[in-house]
């Protein structure tokens, strides 16, 4: 402080100007450091500093911002047209429609299962050994398998009966036809078919002449005299 007081007024002003110039130079260098890092403000091969890029004109900036806003408006208009005028109402109705659709699907599935259970109960009622007290309620798969085996067994039984009937019909066709003798009513006396004056021949001849029945069927022809 004593040294400052000893300085004259002109020297003090010169010293203050020197300090101000040094501070301004430091501030200018600090401001130019980012430009130097980007390549601006550094001398080129000829010693000239490259020119900094010219700032964009206000008209061009306004035009570009207008184009961007126009594109955004077009995109918004397209989205609005795609959604349609009732998009908000559709959004409010969608949860209720989904709930009603889910309830209808559940009700339809419940009815289908009830119908299936009723059909299986009716099938168990007509299958033997499926509704016995000693047998617990069969499952769906077991009921279907038992019904399949029962149907196959019935089909085999029908085939056996058809073969048996065909065999019996074939045996009757090969056998000689036999005429049965007329049956006399109960309580009436048998009338002798031979006249009193007719010559009596052997029993086989008489049987054949009267009724046409072979003598092999007459028990009197085989009796011993």
From Swiss-Prot:
Q: What Gene Ontology molecular-function terms does this entry list?
A: DNA-binding transcription factor activity, RNA polymerase II-specific; E-box binding; protein dimerization activity; sequence-specific double-stranded DNA binding
bHLH domain span:
100-154
Disulfide links within the chain: none
One record GO biological process = positive regulation of transcription by RNA polymerase II
What keywords are annotated for this sequence in UniProt? DNA-binding, Nucleus, Transcription, Transcription regulation
- Localization (cell): Nucleus
Report residue spans for region: Disordered: 35-104
Would you tell me the Gene Ontology cellular component terms?
Answer: chromatin; nucleus
Cited Pfam families: HLH (PF00010)
| SMART domains for the chain | HLH
Which InterPro entries does the record associate with it? bHLH_dom, bHLH_transcription_factors, HLH_DNA-bd_sf
Q: What is its main location?
A: nucleus
- Lineage: superkingdom: Eukaryota
What is the role of the protein in this entry?
May function as transcriptional repressor. May modulate the expression of genes required for the differentiation and/or maintenance of pancreatic and neuronal cell types. May be important for rod bipolar cell maturation.
Q: What is this protein called?
A: Class E basic helix-loop-helix protein 23
Which gene is transcribed and translated to give this protein? BHLHE23
